[in-house]
Curated annotation (Swiss-Prot):
GO terms for molecular function: 4-hydroxy-tetrahydrodipicolinate synthase activity; 5-dehydro-4-deoxyglucarate dehydratase activity. Pathway: Carbohydrate acid metabolism; D-glucarate degradation; 2,5-dioxopentanoate from D-glucarate: step 2/2. One of its GO terms (biological process) is D-glucarate catabolic process. This is Probable 5-dehydro-4-deoxyglucarate dehydratase.
Length: 304
């Protein structure tokens, strides 16, 4: 059973840093539950506001439904008493409903609703898609604005009016006008989180558009740095943010951008670099090349 009402969950998540733990695999690319539990326990030992199990950084796209449910259950069991645990729901409307129900049964506290799978939809279709999921669960639901699910401000307002358990808007597009429209129309009815890759890059300007938090991938391997960066953002300390961008985040981006798909691979590479390996990534992703891993390890040493 969820430990938070939707409103309580929103109030908790919007005031702190969020992260998507990687999913641990063994050498045969099978879920390594023991190692995953160790990683979660370490992550939860820092003051993170919420963890999203089996999300994008957790290679949720490479997990079977049964694996995803097991990952979520493991996360709830290991750290659910200390930090909110959220799960993803995606695919077709029917699949997203199944995901949401399974997450609720597993004890998750909330749902991140991913875009429908490989199909285009108009705003009316998106309203029905989100509505079906919100009706299927009592958990707080966060919609993810990206790719083929771009929610107009009027659409978000319609959904917020219909469903009290719609609590959040995550943006993975970066259209500033769009974000401004949504925040201006909805205000405090929702909470807003940044979801662009390596969200630290955009965190300070997006704070002005109501995005008080974001999902940090690098929290997986440099949690204290990630928390310090987040605090600098919330303090609107531009000098401190820019220093951290120049010293670490931008060089990190340079390594990430060497190969398509490194956005996830580099996070597991970061764990390799600090001696807390979560195993390899599953295909179609590729593990970091040796030189890229060496460069990342040297970079991490500058902030550890």
């Amino acid at each position: 059973m969820a430990k938070y009402t939707p409103n309580e969950l929103a109030d908790t998540l919007k005031e702190g840093l969020l992260s998507f733990p990687v999913t641990s695999f063994d050498a045969n690319l099978q879920f390594d539950e023991e190692n995953y539990r160790k990683h979660l326990a370490w992550q939860a030992s820092f003051p993170v506001a919420g963890l999203f199990a089996a999300g994008g950084t957790g290679e949720g796209f490479s997990l079977t439904p049964a694996e995803s449910e097991r990952v979520v259950r493991t996360a709830v069991d290991e750290v659910g008493s200390r930090v909110p645990v959220l799960a993803s729901a995606g695919g077709s409307t029917a699949q997203a409903i199944e995901n949401a129900k399974a997450a609720e049964a597993a004890g998750a506290d909330g749902i991140l609703l991913l875009p429908p799978y490989l199909t285009e939809a108009d705003q009316a279709g998106l309203v029905e898609h989100v509505s079906a999921v919100c009706r299927a669960t009592s958990l707080g639901v966060i919609i993810y604005n990206r790719a083929n699910a771009i929610y107009k401000d009027t659409t978000v307002a319609t959904l917020a009016d219909r469903h009290a358990n719609l609590i959040g808007f995550k943006d993975g597009v970066g259209d500033l006008e769009h974000d401004a429209r949504v925040y201006a129309k909805l205000g405090d009815r929702l909470f807003y989180l940044g979801g662009l890759p390596t969200a630290e890059t955009f965190a300070l300007p997006l704070l002005q558009l109501g995005m008080s938090t974001y999902s940090s991938a690098m929290y997986n391997f440099v949690p204290q740095f990630a928390l310090d960066f987040y605090q600098d953002v919330r303090n609107q300390d531009r000098a401190a943010v820019n220093k951290k961008l120049n010293d670490f985040v931008i060089p990190y981006l340079d390594i990430r951008d060497r190969v398509k798909g490194y956005s996830v691979s580099i996070v597991k590479g970061g764990l390799d670099a600090i001696g807390r390996s979560a195993g390899p990534v599953r295909t179609p992703l590729q593990n970091l090349a040796p030189q890229d891993l060496a460069d990342l390890k040297a970079l991490i040493a500058t902030v550890s």
